[in-house]
UniProtKB/Swiss-Prot annotation:
UniProt cross-references to InterPro entries, sorted A to Z: YolD
Highest taxon listed in the record's lineage: Bacteria
Protein name: SPbeta prophage-derived uncharacterized protein YolD
Length: 110
C-alpha cells in the first residue's frame, strides 16, 4: 500500500513565501460567506435575547467573524441600542461585547 504524505513531502523544496501563501490559501478555502437572515429569524432572535435578559438565562450565540463562525456562550447583561452591541457575561464572568450585525444564530444553552 502506498502511503502519501500529501503536501508535507514538498515543503522542503518550497520557498518560505510559497509556504505562507499555501497556508493562507488553505485558510481562505475554508471561509464561508455571511448567511443572510430574514425578518422572521431576526425577530425570533430578538425575542430570545429579550427573554434571556429578563429571566437571566444563558444563551449560545453564533457569530460571523472574518469568514468563520464563532460560538459565544453567556448571559445578556445589557443591550446597547446606540452602538448596536450586546454586553454578555461569559462563563468566566468576563464581559464580551457582541456586535448585533455579526449574530447569525441564538439558542438557549441547556
Amino acid at each position: 500500500m502506498l502511503r502519501d504524505r500529501g503536501t508535507i513531502k514538498w515543503t522542503s523544496m518550497m520557498l518560505p513565501e510559497h509556504l505562507t501563501q499555501l497556508k493562507q490559501d488553505l485558510i481562505d478555502v475554508s471561509k464561508i460567506e455571511k448567511p443572510s437572515l430574514d425578518d422572521q429569524q431576526i425577530e425570533e432572535m430578538d425575542i430570545l435575547v429579550s427573554e434571556a435578559l429578563e429571566f437571566n438565562k444563558e444563551l449560545q450565540f453564533k457569530l460571523f467573524h472574518n469568514g468563520f463562525v464563532e460560538n459565544v456562550t453567556g448571559r445578556v447583561h445589557y443591550i446597547n441600542f446606540e452602538q448596536q452591541k450586546l454586553h454578555v457575561k461569559d462563563q468566566n464572568d468576563n464581559t464580551v461585547y457582541i456586535n448585533m450585525n455579526n449574530i447569525i444564530g441564538v439558542t438557549y444553552n441547556d
